[in-house]
Amino acid sequence: QDGQEVDGPVHLGQQGAAFTAVDPCEAREEEALQVNGAAVGTLAESCNRHGVLLIHVSTDYVFDGTSPRPYLETDLVAPMGVYGHSKWEGEEAVRKRLHHHLIIRVSWVFGVHGNNFVKTMLRLAREREALEVVADQRGGPTYAGHIAALILHLYGRTLEQGSTGWGTYHFCGSPVTSWHAFAEA
C-alpha cells in the first residue's frame, strides 16, 4: 500500500508477485504485461518515493535461449514470448524509476511450494509408465531456497556496507544440464 499503512520504517522491497505460468501468459498477454510489467513499475515508483531498496526477481526468458554459452548480464536481451517480454518490461520499469535496485535473473526454479518442473516430473512418474522429456534445452536448475538466501545476503550486505553494486545479476544452480537429464536425476 505504498508504504502508507506500515508501522515503522521500510528498508527493503522484494517483488515476489508474478505471472510465471509461461504457456498461459501467451493466451493472457494483457494480464502478463500488467502483472510482470506495469505493477512492477508501480512498486518501483513507491520504493523510489520512500527511499526503499528494491530487489526484483526476473528470468532467463528475457533471452532467446540460442547462445552456446551461459548468458552474461551485459548480453542483449531477445525475449521470445509474452512471458519473457513481460518480465523484460518489469526490469525496464525498475531501471527507469529507481536507481537503487537489484535485479536478479534466475532460471529453472524449483522448490517445495508452487508448481515447478520437479514436482511435475514426480507426479507424472507416478501416473505414467514412461516419460518423454526434451534434451535440447540447457539451463541451471535453481532451488528457490537458494534464491531466498541470496536475497537475504544481498539485503544484509546493503545494510552493513551501505551502497552496493546496483544493477542486474544472474543467479542459477549448477551444473548446467538438460531438461531430460534433470528429469532422470
Mark where each language-model region is.
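NAD(P)H-binding glycine-rich loop region in Rossmannoid oxidoreductase-like domains
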Residues: Q1-V35
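SDR active-site strand-loop-helix element
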Residues: G13-G16, L54-T59, D64, I104-V106
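Conserved catalytic-core motifs of eukaryotic protein kinase domains, centered on the activation segment
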Residues: D23-E31, G65-R69, G114-N115
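Residue-level signal for the nucleotide or nucleotide-sugar donor/cofactor binding architecture
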Residues: A27, V35, G81, G139-T142, ...
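Catalytic helix-loop patch of NAD(P)-dependent Rossmann-fold dehydrogenases
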Residues: Q34, A39-T42, R49, V62-I104, ...
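NAD(P)-dependent short-chain dehydrogenase/reductase
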Residues: E92-G140, A144-H153
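Mid/C-terminal beta-alpha module of Rossmann-like enzyme folds, strongest
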Residues: L150, R157-A185
